Amino acid sequence: MVHIGPIHRKEYDLEADRSEAVVIAEAPGRVHYLGEHGEPKAGLFLSSAINRRVQLAVSARKDNSLRFYAADSEERKRTSLANLKYKREDRWANYIKVAIYLFVELGCPVKGLNFSLWGNIPQHVSLASSQAIEIAAAVALRELFKVPLDDRTLVSALLAAQKGFFGKSNPPIDYLIALYALENCFVLADETTMEVTPIASILSDYTILLTDSRVPRAGVEEELRERRRAIRKGLEILGSKKQRASLREAAVADLTDLAGILPENIRRRNTHIIQELRRVRDAQEALAGTDPQALAKTILHSHENLRDLYEVSCPEVDWLVKRAQEIDGVLGSRMTGQGFGGCTYTIIRESAVEEYTRRLDDYERIFGFHPVIYRVRLGSGARLLRE
């Protein structure tokens, strides 16, 4: 793996002066295995960090300039503290800038800064690459400025900074997973309590393959907004007719009772969420009980619901999942992330990987997209690195 420290010193001519402190942090990407489409602020996720990560190095400057270098693409961006604002053309650098904004808002004596970034998290496939940059930058700057913020307070401050910098904030779960994940563990992440509970993996005999379908994802945001509206409307009706404050309190039978009131699309969307909440708990029990076959059934049923009820899959992704499930040695396969393309994950024995890879030749012939496979492991959370 690349180490960003020497690259940073070379980029900013710091190789001769070792007295100039360079702080380095890394943060992981993540995979949601179950639960990523849920009730806003009340979701329940089975997730993990992965060993695909970003590394970020930062050092102080003597002026008020802000310099950014992406080592993997050799891109450079620059701005100043006086001009610290979102710029669309700055793309990846905006995720570092929001962390700078965080510490400016906290009243830290921020001066000019040099940043270098390297990462191997696949982008635009719902693996939290941008959140990893934000967390790595926030952790590095916390250390550089010696600010006594615990991880939860850091996440709260980062969400507030996002609102000020971007005009909106992300859900906190991805940041909590990035900070609290443990090696070789899944995590149960609960949005209502902000608790992230590690669950030891029982899959030492398996590897995890992420397959990028390469399907273009135009128009995804409006489709997702429609589903969020359906969840809100379902909650409104369940609240008034069944006194349910949350989908966690609801049952599929409640939706059946309201069949004459609920439009069909709202019934389907909310049915998926209610059943998915149960599936996350079932998966937790399967992992605790060392029952991989029960986990496999849960994964299969989840994808079927995402396809048929929540309707965020697509033919290409369904093909990948179906073909994977046909292979002896595959425990489970499912779409992950926002949907309408993106990635699948496949939990597979090493002996079956060659057969899986061979079947992807048919995918390209049928759909015209060249899929990309990433082999990943359950990874640890964000941390500081020695230079």
Language model feature labels by segment:
Residues 1-31, 37-44, 89-203, 352-353, ...:
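Gly/Ser-rich oxyanion-binding loop with an adjacent helix/lid
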Residues 115-117, 211-213, 344:
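A structural signal for short, well-ordered beta-strand segments
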Residues 42-49, 227-228:
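Short Gly/aromatic-enriched secondary-structure transition segments
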Residues 126, 143-146, 216, 345, ...:
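Amphipathic alpha-helical interaction elements
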Residues 2-34, 55-94, 109, 185-332, ...:
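C-terminal nucleotide
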Residues 340:
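Glycine-rich phosphate-binding loop
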Residues 131-132, 343-347:
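FabD-like malonyl-/acyl-CoA
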